[in-house]
Amino acid sequence: MASGAVADHQIEAVSGKRVAVVGAGVSGLAAAYKLKSRGLNVTVFEADGRVGGKLRSVMQNGLIWDEGANTMTEAEPEVGSLLDDLGLREKQQFPISQKKRYIVRNGVPVMLPTNPIELVTSSVLSTQSKFQILLEPFLWKKKSSKVSDASAEESVSEFFQRHFGQEVVDYLIDPFVGGTSAADPDSLSMKHSFPDLWNVEKSFGSIIVGAIRTKFAAKGGKSRDTKSSPGTKKGSRGSFSFKGGMQILPDTLCKSLSHDEINLDSKVLSLSYNSGSRQENWSLSCVSHNETQRQNPHYDAVIMTAPLCNVKEMKVMKGGQPFQLNFLPEINYMPLSVLITTFTKEKVKRPLEGFGVLIPSKEQKHGFKTLGTLFSSMMFPDRSPSDVHLYTTFIGGSRNQELAKASTDELKQVVTSDLQRLLGVEGEPVSVNHYYWRKAFPLYDSSYDSVMEAIDKMENDLPGFFYAGNHRGGLSVGKSIASGCKAADLVISYLESCSNDKKPNDSL
């Protein structure tokens, strides 16, 4: 009873407050949805003419494909709660044979092992590397192991090389980070790219032991806390999309907001904070593609989800004086091209069932130029006609930044060549669609501490300003959703504190 009364009081304290959310990707939309559900007035500003950010689904000529993220997971609790609240469980779509994933080794796709027995018999790794993996729990006991210095900038490559050897880095870690962040293990900072594993090593020494114990602890918590949740069982099934593509998620979030609460084609040019009162201290101006500039109503708080490279271009005022953003560091972004191709089934001589195939950097010596390919119609048979295979191939990233910028015709030849080696495709694809992401992902490199410090400085120096998105906390869809939800919680706490500061002291 007491906790319920407190919750009611908190809702009453923030109800009706006005919050501006800049950016209508999943971070911004998740934040806006959570704020609105708590009774706040929300306005979302999006520079593009659509919502979704890096989630883009296309339906065309009987095909459905994604030009950004193709799947997501439910590793973050905020994701499951959001799916339940939005009623999206019935639209979830789980890939067929998603455990069948492949890595190229010596020019040939090899299925990744999913358990220790499969690891022993797999040809992905040498016998020496297999033993190193199996012995890691015994070799890396907490008391006798030298773990990473908390202040050290260890790369992903160095971290996994210490635990499992160089071959594991070359043939497992390298293709994985290439496929998930378009980066390479030498460039990525371990503590920013894999913070959970970074912390697991601190606690357990062995990351295998730590991962297993953490997983079982999480399962135990879920069994106690979410027994009645309809999505608990489904949430354990790994990667998923939605019927109609990933765009369904932002579109559904958008529908939860009114027309007046979503401003598309609204690029924010400036923000201004004035500390004259404890409410509605923020104002912002934006411009549309036809150069129409407008000043918007005042707000009590701002959640910024735009990329930091765009934030640097904004004019920020504080108390009538310019608030310089020159402390924001330059961020490296990975360029990426996505090529969607179709082949008639009779032209694919060695089709593979499963999720997809990733290509290690070392396999470039065999002529491969792409990062990997998703077997889109194998995962989701309703994404193409029954006589057609649909493939989604990724090109570029840190491995080949110039190739990412190539023309559609050039990339078609590159992709067709790789698919010929991998799957035995013959001839030209029936259809080709190309989308180029100039800045697909921020690179969590060795200097990323300075980025996090800059974000903290903005939030500390600008009352009521909060940052969310894939520049903080992770690149995945789930991490981005969690980031937006956490920013919404911080806004609510901030507004509650402002409300409490305004109240007279009524203690006896």
Swiss-Prot record:
Domain of life where this protein originates: Eukaryota
UniProt: FAD binding residues: 23-28, 46-47, 68-71, 268, 475-477
Pathway(s) it belongs to: Porphyrin-containing compound metabolism; protoporphyrin-IX biosynthesis; protoporphyrin-IX from protoporphyrinogen-IX: step 1/1; Porphyrin-containing compound metabolism; chlorophyll biosynthesis
This enzyme's EC code(s): 1.3.3.4
Cellular compartment(s): Plastid, Chloroplast; Mitochondrion
Transit peptide, UniProt annotation: 1-22
GO terms for MF: oxygen-dependent protoporphyrinogen oxidase activity
Phenotype on disruption: Embryo development arrested at one-cell zygotic stage.
Reaction catalysed by this enzyme: protoporphyrinogen IX + 3 O2 = protoporphyrin IX + 3 H2O2
Cofactor: FAD
Chain residue ranges for the region called Disordered: 219-239
Protein family (similarity comment): Belongs to the protoporphyrinogen/coproporphyrinogen oxidase family. Protoporphyrinogen oxidase subfamily.
Name this polypeptide is given: Protoporphyrinogen oxidase 2, chloroplastic/mitochondrial
Name of the gene: PPOX2
